[in-house]
Amino acid sequence: MEWWTAFQAFILGVVEGLTEFLPISSTGHQIIVADLIGFGGERAKAFNIIIQLAAILAVVWEFRGKIFQVVRDLPSQHQAQRFTVNLLIAFFPAVILGVLFADLIHEWLFNPITVALALVVGGVIMLWAERRQHVIRAEHVDDMTWKDALKIGCAQCLAMVPGTSRSGATIIGGLLFGLSRKAATEFSFFLAMPTMVGAAVYSGYKYRELFRPEDLPVFAVGFVTSFVFAMVAVRALLKFIGNHSYAAFAWYRIAFGLLILATWQFHLIDWSTAGDL
């Protein structure tokens, strides 16, 4: 493994780990950064699956106590059963639309301009959602109803557009639908588990011929890096939301999106090959 390839794997692992669970769009950042450092082609598809799986495993580890409790109580406790049902309800809209439209979306929307526009629009919506008056009906994830779960699941489908952000769509959706900031964030993390594992399994099977033994060192660098930085990001976000709003992320989205649009408009960066990830 050449040092430059290892460096590319490290950088993309950092980007995935830091952005996957922040409401700033990991896919959008991956598309932009991968193009800037020249990491693309067939190997990039397999690599992306690996680092996304690492990020979700970090969340599984962080919430292992809650997961164990739900599994243990599932046969007899109504609260654990309702939580599990809510996750399944929120999970299925993305499954249905993903199967129907994933390839079409990847072909037509995986480009920096779509990412930039989605970043800006999502940032504006995030600011609006944070500034409106909130009526909190569900303080904790265990207080959610199946209707709350269904609405958040539908909101998650918006993240099929690169630049929208899966966590951003589910968290802001949760706030708009009456969840507390803590409940919306935690449910977004839990919903990420079946959603991202399902996507990784589907993509892994679809691109199974791209996984080659000679790429294992590159995958290992990306996997470890993504896992470590995802753990850092998850813990930091859970601590951050205790005393802060999501406005800082909204302004970051808007600024980053406008920067991409400016580099495109004034031909400062050639984005013509971006999106091959």
Curated annotation (Swiss-Prot):
GO terms for cellular component: plasma membrane. The keyword Kinase does not apply. Signal peptide: none annotated. The chain crosses the membrane at residues 47-67, 85-105, 108-128, 183-203, 218-238, 249-269. GO terms for biological process: cell wall organization; peptidoglycan biosynthetic process; regulation of cell shape; response to antibiotic. Keywords: Antibiotic resistance, Cell inner membrane, Cell membrane, Cell shape, Cell wall biogenesis/degradation, Hydrolase, Membrane, Peptidoglycan synthesis, Transmembrane, Transmembrane helix. It is a multi-pass membrane protein. Its main location: membrane. It is an enzyme of class 3 (hydrolase). Catalyzes the dephosphorylation of undecaprenyl diphosphate (UPP). Confers resistance to bacitracin. This is Undecaprenyl-diphosphatase. It comes from Pseudomonas paraeruginosa (strain DSM 24068 / PA7) (Pseudomonas aeruginosa (strain PA7)).
